Regions:
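Short loop/turn segments that flank or connect secondary-structure elements
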Residues: 1-259
Length: 259
């Protein structure tokens, strides 16, 4: 569905109704197989194996400040982070500008606490947010809290911009995404949330779309989900079907026998 941006003239949004009305949820530590070339749930790395690419300097600086809040008890690689910094160069973009990502330690993001660490496996920044009553988007790199939502902008010949808001599929990772042994938006086991994505990831969507547009999207999707026919289901969302068990027939002696 398409919306005109309520606060920016010349920007039109294309919204992915199918994914936003699905019941996807992050299953980190509860069935997530990771993003390596082989399934590795025992490593509990989620999508943290390659570090997080920063969107811009503002994103990077915010994470640097957040890292300063972490204690040694909260962050397994605190000493490495303080000694070498939490980010490193990772190449250049198409315009020749240096790109940065979170530093890697032992083949995964420096903020990823591993199995066996007393605070438990998972992102130290995410865990910090949960302990302090903040939303994880306040502390984590943008790409981390946005997943699996994705925004792309495309300039038009008439000077306008079309922004597409959709699912972050394998293609979002570049060529390497096709080598993943597993990806969560293709896994039926991840489509088990009680609420649709546009509700469960409301805070993330507000930050990506803006409050005014988010409210318009919610109003539209609320109406669409109640309409007949409902939106097309996501290809990975398998509807749960309940079947009634047939009662066993009784034999001539009163005992039950199965059909």
């Amino acid at each position: 569905v398409t919306f005109d941006d309520p606060n920016e003239e010349g920007r039109r949004w294309q919204i992915d109704v199918t994914f936003l009305t699905s019941h996807w949820q992050c299953i980190f530590g509860h069935g997530c197989q990771g993003v390596l070339t082989e399934r590795a749930p025992e490593m509990v790395q989620g999508c943290c194996s390659y570090g997080a690419h920063f969107s811009n300097r503002k994103d990077r600086d915010r994470v640097v400040r957040a890292a300063k809040e972490l204690t040694d008890d909260e962050w397994q690689y605190a000493k490495a982070g303080r000694a070498k910094g939490v980010y490193a160069k990772c190449g250049k973009d198409e315009e020749g500008r240096i790109e940065w990502r979170t530093r890697l330690v032992d083949d995964a993001c420096i903020f990823l606490n591993r199995p066996g660490f007393p605070a438990g496996p998972g992102c130290a920044l995410h865990q910090k947010a949960m302990r302090t009553g903040r939303h994880h988007s306040d502390l984590k790199p943008e790409v981390c809290w946005q997943l699996p939502l994705r925004r792309t902008d495309e300039d038009q010949e008439d000077g306008t911009v079309v922004s597409t808001f959709s699912e972050f599929g394998r293609d979002g990772w570049g060529d390497g995404g096709q080598e993943f042994a597993w990806w969560c938006t293709e896994a039926p086991e991840a489509f088990t949330a009680a609420e649709p994505v546009y509700r469960s990831m409301g805070e993330e969507m507000r930050k990506m779309l803006g409050d005014d547009l988010y409210k318009q999207v919610v109003a539209y999707l609320d109406e669409r989900t109640q309409s007949k026919p409902p939106p097309a289901p996501h290809p990975s969302e398998v509807p749960v079907q309940f079947t009634r068990r047939r009662p066993a027939a009784r034999g001539s002696n009163g005992s039950r026998r199965r059909r």
